[in-house]
């Protein structure tokens, strides 16, 4: 699963963006 780049890697990813933590998604 892909993780957010901010907020300690937490948050829901919607439309390639982290909605809950307002960060950018990181692909690993």
UniProtKB/Swiss-Prot annotation:
The modification N6-acetyllysine is found at residues 15, 25. It comes from the Eukaryota. Keywords: Acetylation, Disulfide bond, Secreted. It is found in: Secreted. GO terms for cellular component: extracellular region. Its main location: secreted. The two N6-acetyllysines at position 15 and 25 have been deduced from the mass difference of 42. They are not common in venom proteins. InterPro entries: HSP_DnaJ_Cys-rich_dom_sf. The keyword Acetylation applies. Expressed by the venom gland. Disulfide bonds join 4-21, 7-18. The keyword Disulfide bond applies. The cysteine framework is XIV (C-C-C-C). In vitro, inhibits proliferation of the mice ovarian cancer cells ID8. This is Conotoxin Vi14b.
